Amino acid sequence: EVYKDSENNTEHRNMGTTIVACLVHDDNAIVANVGDSRLYLYRDEELKQITVDHSLVNDLLSSGTITEEEAVDFAQKNVITRSLGIQDTVDVDIFNVELVKGDLILMCTDGLTSQLENEDIVDIIKAY
């Protein structure tokens, strides 16, 4: 639908969006993502990113082209490599996460993760 709207409405041409989705059933979470919206698992006071960012900066980090330090100030760190709406099909990453009692799931956009370090997010979770 996002792609169709982009094709049919000139104001929305080349419009795209990222998504993270999660279905929890019993002790399992099935997670899907496209783009740089993330899902984290908080367990035993540790925050673990489950999804993989579909972004230029993450691709360059993974290939060893740039370092973590270089990624912080990378000029094109907002460039995503996968999104909904730009093409008529998209590859979606799917993850299965086994859950245990006390686990928390955090789904968020880069609006959160571009402003807060993981340690800050953990502090906020601990406060609640």
Regions found by a protein language model. Name each.
Residues E1-Y128:
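PP2C/PPM-type serine/threonine phosphatase catalytic domain
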